Amino acid sequence: MSRRRQNDEEDEIQMKRRRGAPLIGDVEKKLQEVIGKVGDKNTGSSIEANLEKLTAFLHDDLEKYRSSIIDIVAGCAIYLPNRVTVYTTLVGLLNAKNFNFGGDVVEKLIAEQQDLLLKQKYQEAQNLAIFLCDLGNSGVLTAQSIGEYLESFIAAAFEENMPQVRNDYYIQTVLRCLPWIGKELTEKAQEQMENIVEAVGKYLEMRNKNHVPLLRVWREGSTDQEQEDYLESLSAQIENLRTANWMQNHIPRYYNTFEAVLQDALQHNLPSFSSPEHTSDMIYPYPLVVFRLFQDADCGTDSQLPSGHSIDRFLFEGEISWIIEKNQFNRKSCARELLAFADENPTAPVGFLIFETIFGQMLRLPHAPYPAIFHCSLVLELLKLKPNDYPNILCKTVDLIFSRADSMQPICIDRMVDWFSFHLSNFQYRYTWDEWKDCISNDEFSGRQVFLREVIEKCRRLGSYEKIIAALPSDFVKIHPASPEIRYLLDEEDAMSQRAETFTQMFQERQPADAFLKELKSTDENDELPYNINEFGVFVTVMLKMASKTYSHNFSALFRYKDTLKTVCDAAEQYQEKLLETLYSCWKSNQQMLMILTDKLLKMQIIDCSSVVGWLFDEKMWQEHNRQWLFEVLNQALEKLTRQINVVEKDIKDLTEKVESKEKVTEAGDVKMEEETVVDEKLKGEMEELENHKEKLDRMVSFQRNLFNDFLIAFVEEIKSAATNTSEMDGSGDVGGSESSKFLWLRGRFCHVLLAHAETLLKHSSSIAEEVFSEGADPNISECFNQFQSLRF
């Protein structure tokens, strides 16, 4: 047979195969496509009609591709929560035609839910709970068994000696299911429904709510909208819905169209929920406080804003949040889908809810769910797509937040500063600045003045100094940032000027590190330090002055004289303190340079975290504690240490797995005799390395714990001092004690530190409680720490 004829026959066989049964992968792709698109509203026909066609299409091949169809439906249930009722209707229609299929779907979903909970994917597991409950509306599951299923969640929440955050999650899951299944349970499983309502009420009564003040964006009583705990708010919304006989207009119930078919279908019983065993390494979602910004009067539109305790408000926010989550890596598609959602719901001012949700996420405590740059770019994209309406909504948003800034948590002010400065940089820093000039006369710890001052400073970092000053009204001169130039304080009359000239000449001659070390050697026999500390300060001053032209020049100087700096700084802690003091003295008016160089010194291991923290909380630096840059540097240093510990922990985990794997191989006798010695040597080496890593981790964790304790003690002392010494002289106004703006600001910064490093500090909470908050601690500050501890209570 010729090669050409053979190839032709093979091609013919391939073509026949393609015309015949398609490959499994192709079938799955086609199924995924048709099932995934059944809820699309732009197909030219109704969703009900699409469901009917899809049911007929799937039923024909149900036995052949059952497993694939079930997997795809399960994926839709988990990852498309906005189409719950679409897919529960589909499952209901298929169950009416094939009873076993409905049972297989339920079995698959139950298994998936358990797996998701074990993987700590709590949102996805909650999506499945809602889906399973809604199957009761589409004739797949009995109302009685769904009631028992929800009761088992409540039973899990009442288990003893469990973290409250775990119990909260199970109660929240029950409450989130009720908008879908509440009416059905009330009509067909009244006893279970009453048990659920009673148990939820009992749980909320006995629940600890210490965390609520700490997670509020604004201090209690400072706004006309209550900042409620998320469970309390959802419970009130559900109670109002129940009072209204479960009537709401947001959830589309496609199964009602097929009631005649679905009501005759055989139903399955949903097994009771079995909660995974709790272990100490399980991390549950933090509690939340509901963010509210707008009331109906703020919107000024014909459509009415749902009230805070309306279930529609919850459902709108949930759908907006899901659209953002789904598109968190694509701002353009996110903005388009948000606008499409607003167009689909003309009866409500969805634009206001979109901005309220975005800023609620941006200001969420303890952590925002997405990087700041995503929210920044999403807002810009929304303004671009809706230029006639959304800029006005954004202006109202900013004005409302600014008007409440005096009672705002400092950590939230920081986030608003970061967003607003970035936003203004896209509009040449133009804004209605004159409307805010009244806050310039406020004291320097006033939240509104801090916000305005820090926004201007951040804008200066993003643009030129001259451009920022030109954009500001003349009234703002009091809070203008200083010109960002280096401060060189050595002149001819200075006693150290001669030494400065010597160092300048040595730098120009590019002399080696040894020459500088020799020059810095102390000549005083009574000096306990090996190097003259004042001359070291002069050396650093001259180096920074000569390298002050650009960031690159500064980096180059640090790398060139790294050996000199490191040798001196390793000799004693005082040299690290002197280096940082000199750096601050030179670059005080350029906070960005100060932050970048401090970070670079940490990365080069010339200084360590403890020296940075000690410097920032030295009494001489208290004057800077109303500035954002200081806490940015602090958090950078502490996060760097935490990351280093995380790396060592990962190394230990990897080494442990290696050692255990080799031990199993050795014990099983799978190693050849001639290779046994080599394997034993490798195992011994890895075990020694593992022990060394464990010892290193113990040292690092101990260092971290002591560092947090020391600086928190220093911070508490400063706050206590602020409570007793506030006066007009220190910029804190004429109100003294714990009501002064300075005290409230510093206490807010204390909460900021706790929240920014929540995961780490919660591990050391018992040590902090013992070392920092012993007898005699200020109750105002102790209360902050008690609230913090309840986050994982």
Curated annotation (Swiss-Prot):
Transmembrane segments: none annotated. It comes from the Eukaryota. GO terms for cellular component: nuclear cap binding complex; nucleus. One of its GO terms (molecular function) is RNA cap binding. Residues 28-242 form the MIF4G domain. It is found in: Nucleus. Keywords: mRNA capping, mRNA processing, mRNA splicing, Nucleus, RNA-mediated gene silencing. The keyword Glycoprotein does not apply. Its main location: nucleus. The keyword Nucleus applies. GO terms for biological process: 7-methylguanosine mRNA capping; mRNA export from nucleus; nuclear-transcribed mRNA catabolic process, nonsense-mediated decay; primary miRNA processing; RNA splicing. Component of the nuclear cap-binding complex (CBC), a heterodimer composed of ncbp-1 and ncbp-1 that interacts with m7GpppG-capped RNA. Component of the cap-binding complex (CBC), which binds cotranscriptionally to the 5'-cap of pre-mRNAs and is involved in various processes such as pre-mRNA splicing and RNA-mediated gene silencing (RNAi). The CBC complex is involved in miRNA-mediated RNA interference and is required for primary microRNAs (miRNAs) processing. In the CBC complex, ncbp-1 does not bind directly capped RNAs (m7GpppG-capped RNA) but is required to stabilize the movement of the N-terminal loop of ncbp-2 and lock the CBC into a high affinity cap-binding state with the cap structure. PANTHER family: CAP BINDING PROTEIN, NUCLEAR CAP-BINDING PROTEIN SUBUNIT 1. Belongs to the NCBP1 family. This is Nuclear cap-binding protein subunit 1.
